[in-house]
Swiss-Prot record:
GO terms for molecular function: transmembrane transporter activity. It comes from Escherichia coli (strain K12). This is Inner membrane protein YihN. Disulfide bonds: none annotated. The keyword DNA repair does not apply. The gene is yihN. PANTHER family: GLUCOSE-6-PHOSPHATE EXCHANGER SLC37A4, PROTEIN UHPC, PUTATIVE-RELATED. PROSITE patterns: MFS. It is found in: Cell inner membrane. Pfam families: MFS_1. Keywords: Cell inner membrane, Cell membrane, Membrane, Transmembrane, Transmembrane helix, Transport.
């Protein structure tokens, strides 16, 4: 699939993608310690995520201008090191407003400066027929890195007493890891050593100057962006499976952190290759795969609402939530792959990734706060059923958009073949 040199670069990009989000995603392994030692409610944790996402959304729009221009070596290494330094500040246990400030800056360092450039770098490693597998293995690699690093941080937390000192030690561990990766990126990554492999239409110099305008006018890219939007709106709800199992199923606190890691990271290792292989090898279309899985997600969420959770065994509840999460992670693995499937011009790929991220990750601006406040205002199982219902509506909307995208890509390919004839 890839040469040894490209596999080495792929591994480096995976290491970057698997470490930079450990601090912004601190809640995944340390949700309960965050509530206890940062003194935060469900809604306030949701607010921190929403502030982060607001800055991220604005940042993604701004990154449309530079994602194809600035050297990756500098933007990626700086973003990693800056993220680590913000983590060091978190160990001072800032107040609520300090938490909001740090999570806002995470939106700049992790998302605006790093993510679109990282996605473009991954996409350029393979041709248009390899995009599903490429992004699938990328998510798998991130899942492996995520899991190893997160469980290591949890071990550090336990080693230092599972209290305030352990929480600080866990944050220090995350911070030092991401700074180290930033230094490696700076000395190893070479912007000139990689040539784009995606078989796409080339454009002349005049077109390059208007790539942003042409991206904004491309209906296919907008449909891809909204596909990502609805996947991510459902994905945001996975975070609240953690308090769901603790409050409804009375999951022991010792297992809450481990479940959070499995829910957010281990599922990437399962979902990544499954989503990539099915979309490329069986359906031969990432957009069709997203369509089918949106339909399955809608049905699964309706079933989740109807189940008698209060009388079910805890391990059955864990199996149900993890099973649904696996479906969502197969979608996350390939939701940018339609950009390669649609053969978007190479000089527009970075801008297309930025626009897709700008629209696609927008749910995090409001979903975390929305879900958190619903749970705070509706204690018990009823709050979770409301959240699951909203997630089902997002999944159904995603199915509708996916049908439109499949038709659009098919039409686009026919037009390109006609133009070449």
């Amino acid at each position: 699939m890839l040469t040894k040199k490209k596999w080495a670069l792929f591994s480096l990009l995976t290491l970057c993608g698997g470490t930079i989000y450990k601090l912004p995603s601190l809640k995944d392994a340390f949700y309960i310690p965050m509530q206890e030692y940062f003194h935060l409610t469900n809604g306030q944790i949701g607010n921190a995520m929403s502030v982060n996402s607001f800055v991220t959304t604005v940042g993604f729009f701004l990154s449309i201008y530079f994602a194809d221009k600035l050297p990756r070596r500098y933007t990626m290494s700086f973003s990693l090191i800056a993220t680590g330094l913000l983590g060091v500040y978190l160990t001072t246990m800032p107040g609520y407003w300090g938490i909001l400030f740090v999570w806002a800056l995470f939106g700049v360092t992790c998302d605006m400066m790093n993510w679109p450039v990282l996605l473009k770098s991954v996409s350029r490693l393979g041709n248009s027929e390899q995009q599903g597998r490429l992004f699938g293995f990328f998510e798998t690699g991130r899942g492996i890195v995520d899991t190893v690093v997160a469980f290591s941080a949890l071990a550090v937390f336990t080693w230092f007493g599972s209290g305030l000192l352990g929480f600080k030690a866990g944050i220090w561990f995350y911070s030092l890891i991401v700074i180290a990766v930033g230094i490696i990126i700076f000395f190893v990554l070479n912007d000139k050593e990689e040539a784009p492999s995606v078989e796409v239409k080339k454009e002349d110099g005049a077109s390059k100057n208007t790539s942003m305008t042409s991206v904004l006018k491309d209906k296919t890219i907008w449909l891809i962006a909204f596909n990502v939007f609805f996947v991510y709106a459902v994905y945001c709800g996975l975070t609240f499976f953690i308090p769901f199992l603790k409050n409804i199923y009375l999951l022991p606190v010792a297992l809450v952190g481990a479940y959070g890691i499995i829910n957010q990271y281990c599922l990437k290792m399962i979902g990544g290759p499954i989503g990539g292989m099915i979309s490329d090898k069986i359906l031969k279309s990432p957009s069709k795969y997203l369509c089918y899985t949106f339909i399955i997600s809608t049905a699964a969420l309706v079933l989740l609402i109807m189940l008698p959770h209060e009388s079910m065994p805890v391990y059955l509840g864990m199996a149900c939530t993890l099973g649904f999460g696996a479906i969502v992670f197969t979608q996350r693995a390939v939701f940018f792959a339609p950009i390669g499937e649609a053969k978007i011009a190479e000089n527009k790929t970075g801008a297309a990734m930025a626009l897709g991220s700008f629209i696609g990750y927008a749910p995090a601006m409001f979903c975390f706060s929305l879900y958190g406040y619903i749970l705070d205002l509706n204690p018990g199982i009823i709050g979770y059923k409301i959240v699951f219902g909203i997630m089902a509506c997002f999944a159904f909307s995603g199915a509708v958009v996916s049908v439109m995208l499949v038709k659009r890509i098919s039409q686009r390919k026919k037009e390109m073949l006609a133009a070449e004839a």
